[in-house]
């Protein structure tokens, strides 16, 4: 007996994420999968050596409160102004669910981080992609149309092009009533 769950229809519409080619060479550093080309800093090594290994078998604090408190103190904000997740994709997922639910299309570049359309499809968020120019830059005029939010990486993935502060400010000023996310995962 086959039971169709309500959520199946939504999930079946999502095109699976396909990772780019992953060469299997021992000395290759894959920046596209966030591998770091540098060894851990001496302070990190020392902290790891001094870490109580028994704690590694336990789940961390479920709301990461110690980390949230430290980040809030460091940046001079209240802890309730800090959000952490289990990776950037988790944070992006929560951002899409939280901020992009007006029914209006969100905007992002046509050549960009490949998970934006996956999240939009999964959460049934309409979207419109905006073409980059011949030098792989965003055209701020494209982001002045009626929308339900804007998201773009800076620098862009996969082009590596970094937009100017002036362009970002122009997009922010043109969108005072929606959330604009400048995804700086690759800074």
Predicted regions: what they are:
Residues 56-177, 181, 186-187:
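Conserved core of the PLP fold type I
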Residues 2-58, 146:
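N-terminal "arm"/small-domain region of PLP-dependent enzymes with the aminotransferase-like
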């Amino acid at each position: 007996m086959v039971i169709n769950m309500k959520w199946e229809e939504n999930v079946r519409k999502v095109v699976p994420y396909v990772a780019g080619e992953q060469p299997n060479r021992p000395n290759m550093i894959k920046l596209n999968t966030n591998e770091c080309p540098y060894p851990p800093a001496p302070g990190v090594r020392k902290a790891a050596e001094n870490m109580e290994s028994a704690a590694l078998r336990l789940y961390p604090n479920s709301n990461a409160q110690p980390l949230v408190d430290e980040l809030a103190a460091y940046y001079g904000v209240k802890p309730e102004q800090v959000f952490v997740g289990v990776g950037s994709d988790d944070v992006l997922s929560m951002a899409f669910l939280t901020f992009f639910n007006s029914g209006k299309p969100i905007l992002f570049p046509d050549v960009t981080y490949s998970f934006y359309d996956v999240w939009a499809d999964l959460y049934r968020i309409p979207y419109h992609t905006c073409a980059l120019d011949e030098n792989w830059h965003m055209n701020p005029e494209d982001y002045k149309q009626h929308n339900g939010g804007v998201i773009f990486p800076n620098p862009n993935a996969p082009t590596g092009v970094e937009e100017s502060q002036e362009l970002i400010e122009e997009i922010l000023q043109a969108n005072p009533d929606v959330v604009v996310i400048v995804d700086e995962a690759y800074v």
